Every structure is written in C-alpha cells, then in structure tokens.
C-alpha cells in the first residue's frame, strides 16, 4: 500500500525492517495513516523521522474491542439437555467500518456460540450499529471472548433456574469423546477433544469440592466468597498460507526466514525447537530471521496461527531438506537413495558405517555432479503450508474470589486453568501466553471500560488515569495445566494458544462474582466491568430494598 499507492515507487524499492514490536493484540495489524506519512516525510526531508503517538491519541483513534449487547434464549428438555438456542446481538462498529469490524461479531464470534455443547440448533442474528465512537476491531480473541462470555454466563444462569449445579448442567450437555469428530450446529467440525475430562480435571485442580469450607472461612471475616467456572473453545489457525525459507551458511549454521513476526510470543524459540527436533541439529546452529521485507516471505501474525501454520511450514521445510539431502548423500557416497537413512543430522548408508553429516551434504550439494537431474544446487529451499482446517483449542477456567460487601471490592484468591492445546511444543511459552491472556480477561471483567459523555460524545477515559488497566495486585497467580488431545488438522498436532486466556477469563470471573452475591442479594447478573463502585451500588440497592 505505502510503496505502490502513496510513494508510487514499487514494492521492491521499499524495505521494511521490524524490530521488537511488543504486544499489539489486533490493533497493530492495520496501516495507520501515520505510517505512510512518516515514510513520506523521511523521503521528503532525506533524514530519519520518528513518530511516537501519545496515550491520548491512542485512546481517541486506535481501534478498540468488544461492545456488544445480546439477548439469548435456550430451550431445554425435561432432563435439562439443550434443544436449541437463539441469540440476537447488537454489535457497535464505531463511526466507520474497520478492517475486520463486521467479521468479528458475525463469522468469528457467532460461530463459537455453539461452544462445547451438543446443542442441535443455534440461531444467531447480529445487527451492526454505527456509533459515534472509534471503530471496533480485533482485540485478543476477536469475537470469541464475546461468544464465550455470553454462552458461559447463560449456562450458569440456566443452571440456577433449573436447580442444577453449574458443573452438572455442563456435564449433561458437553460433547463426549465418542462423538468426536463433532459437527456443530453452526458449521464447524471439532476434530479432537475430551471436554468432560478437561472440565473435571480443572475442577479437581481448583479443589472445587473444598469450596464450602473456604466459603465459611470467608464468611467469618465478613466476606462473600464465590466460585465460578467457564468452558471455552476457540476456532483459530486458519487463513492465508505461511512460508519458511532455509539457507545453509558457510559456518555450518542454518538461517530460517519466516513471514510471521513475533511480538513476545517466543516464535524464535518454538521454530528453532521444531527444526532442531526434526533435523537433529543443535539449536545454536539455527537462526530464525523475521521482519525484513527484503529477505522474509509474506506472512501475518494473528489469530493464534503462527505455530499451527508457520510452524508446520518449518516442519515441512525440514522434511524437504532431509529428502533432498538423501538424494545428494546417495550420489556423493555412490549408493541408492533408498539405502540412505537419516538420524541426528547424519546421513548413513543402511547397514554400514559410511556417513555424511548434514552440513557436509549441504556443501556437497553445491557441486552439480552430486545432484540428480533437475535438482538445483545446494540444500537451500522453501516450503509453504496452506492450512487445511482450523484448530480448536479448548479448556476450563475456574475462578475463586471474595467480595467485600461494604466496598464492592473484588479480590481473586485462586485461579485455575485446564487447557487442551494439542501438542505442547514448549509448555513454558504456552503458560506465558495463557497468563497474559488471563490478565487481559480479568481487566475486561473488572476494570476496563471506555467512557464517552452521553450528551457531547466527548471521550472521558482518555488516559491511564481514567482507563483502569489491571495492576499486578489484581491479577493472581495462575495454576495452569493441560490435558491435551492431538489436533488432526496439522502435522504438528498443535492448537493455537495465543488468545485462549482472554477467552475463558471474563465469564469465569463474573460467574464467580454472581455466585458470591446471589444468596445475599438475589442478583442473578451484573454487567462487565464489575468495578468496585458498580458492585457496591448493586449491593446497596439490595440493602435499600430489604429495608423498605
């Protein structure tokens, strides 16, 4: 866009290099007007130009997320099995339509309203509303948190109405392992999963059975203790193809060029692990290169797709190197390609001690005499992976908290997650991704809200003094574990993980709050964010009703 439409110089003449970006969570996907202006100014002035937006600018112009009002209805049979659900959603789109603005509440979010349940019929009607606000667009989860919040709050509400515990109603309606692959009422196919076990293990890890005793301890201190759960599923890892390119260097290292760009997820570590494990090459010999338009292929980070798609491309590239290497090794050692085996970076003639290392074969491949007809010199190559289907990470979040009835303050005491991410390439990276998502989900549940003056339309939350991000004392330590079922739609068996924490957190937190206050107030629902002020107002209104 910048090269062709604004500078009119053609893409080959514009080089873009990306350093450490930091989290974007959706907002940084787009071409903001300042980007081409900075390039134009730099070209005009013939000097470096740097643009730093201030926080107020960001609040006034960057896309924001969520902002739905929904009505849900559910039909159940006499055994409390779900028969059908109808949802009408009014989705605020902002003053003008952004890139994925209409896609998020419709195709991205609405498809997840089937959840992990066997509901045979689901009807969804989404109405987009233009509002005098900044546009809404992708924010970590992009439609899936909205769907999970609506569905899981609704399931808890239904359980209370029919006289069942939240876990019992879910157990009656969750898709069972013997029903996988499961075709949802909204057109998705869950290829793998053990949803019952994930929920039960999450409850066990959270010591769900011991909650009553802990609740009594809180009551003795004058606090109201609540516990809430939420299951979730996310459709992710689809979209455009991703490519990986390998270049063997003279110092016996491999440079791997990828199109995705890390913003703190640890792509470099994960891609290195994939190639190192497949080729048997020390991780120190693999260099991941990203963020340079002159040398890296096209790609996009987003939608929890980097490892399932780009990671699968790195895996395919590794296999391609091995297969070509066998041909070269066979020619160099005067053997049949079928007699060559590969293990731990060594090509060997089966049944002999005749070997060549991967890097020796890479050097030999530069000599045309070692190449079969039609093969290009070297082991350098590329591989493109086109996603065949989405992945469906899923899990169960359990939140336990205390409410101070005198102030409305909420303190999260315990937070437990049981996730299914398929193959866990690097559990530490996965845990970091989930922790970050939970922090953002807790922020949505308890503190974060963009406020405009109703009369003037003036933005009232234009700084971090007015817009309350969750602080370290709000986000608890998280007990995280996995019960994984291998994904069948990509060769790594992985499922996307980048957005999962932000999807499961909001409903589990609000379910816990309602659980804490219901027996004291009879209140069955509170809207997010459940700030201390708003919750105190609910409690105080109930006191006044009782006193009247």
Provide a role label for each language-model segment.
Residues 68-70, 240-242, 395-397:
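Short, small/polar residue-rich loop motifs at catalytic or cofactor-binding pockets
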Residues 24-46, 50-52, 267-275:
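Thiamine diphosphate
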Residues 1-6, 226-260, 265:
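Conserved beta-alpha junction segments in alpha/beta enzyme cores
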